[in-house]
């Protein structure tokens, strides 16, 4: 997968969750010069091996019924993606303008050597500080909306929480799907990642579909 194969497109008139995520995608790209690709929402896909084992992984939709794996890689530089949880909550504040709340995580995967020339230290705290400062900027989400940061994960298995990498590591089941190669190549310096969990509450997105 080369950079030219990544197809980031934005809907012309997004609503609900798409509207919020597209705005955040654009702000991430505008504000973080080291971020090469800001993907939108990830989808949970499955691969099955000959032994009947199922491997779950996050993937971004790339158009034309194609998906891109978001497992640790160096195919398209430093990247981010959104992991959105079920359920999404709707609170009937009023019939015409209910409150809409969703929870999720913003995940980053990056190569420190592409960001810092100095490799005598691990600069993950600097990256975390930069991202958190951006996400807590007043007005980071538009309209009558509020974004709250709730948790930050940095261990590799927790960055991929909810997918098979987490299960493999937590159960000490090191087998299949090239996990040993991930260990050797991507789970050590200069590679690192972040999983920032959040919730967003808004009232200005639901009015378009309430009759």
Q: Where are the regions that the model predicts?
A:
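Hydrophobic side chains in beta-strands
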Residues: 84, 108, 196-200
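Short, flexible beta-strand-to-coil junctions
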Residues: 87, 111-113, 201-203
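Small/polar-rich, solvent-exposed N-terminal microdomains that initiate assembly or binding
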Residues: 1-94
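Short, charged interaction patches at domain edges and termini
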Residues: 1-38, 95-99, 149-211
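A broad, low-specificity signal for short, low-complexity segments enriched in glycine/proline
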Residues: 56-71, 143-161
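Extracellular/virion structural assembly segments
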Residues: 93-101, 105-150
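A broad, low-specificity signal marking well-ordered, structured residues that form hydrophobic/aromatic
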Residues: 79-80, 104, 196
């Amino acid at each position: 997968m080369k950079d030219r194969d990544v197809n980031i497109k934005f809907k012309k008139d997004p609503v609900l969750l798409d509207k919020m995520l597209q705005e955040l995608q654009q702000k991430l790209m505008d504000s973080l010069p080291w971020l090469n690709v800001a993907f939108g929402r990830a989808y949970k896909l499955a691969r099955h091996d000959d032994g009947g084992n199922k491997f779950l992984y996050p993937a971004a939709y790339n158009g034309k019924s194609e998906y891109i794996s978001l497992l640790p890689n160096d195919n398209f530089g430093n990247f981010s993606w959104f992991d959105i949880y079920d359920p999404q909550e709707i609170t009937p504040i009023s019939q015409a303008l209910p409150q809409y709340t969703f929870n999720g995580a913003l995940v980053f995967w990056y190569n420190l050597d592409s960001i810092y020339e100095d490799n005598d230290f691990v600069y993950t705290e600097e990256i975390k500080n930069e991202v958190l400062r951006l996400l807590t900027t007043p007005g980071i989400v538009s309209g009558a909306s509020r974004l709250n940061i709730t948790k930050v994960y940095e261990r590799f298995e927790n960055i991929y929480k909810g997918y098979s990498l987490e299960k493999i590591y937590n159960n000490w089941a090191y087998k299949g799907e090239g996990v040993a190669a991930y260990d050797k190549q991507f789970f050590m310096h200069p590679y690192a990642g972040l999983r920032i969990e959040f919730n967003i509450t808004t009232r200005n997105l639901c009015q378009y579909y309430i009759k």
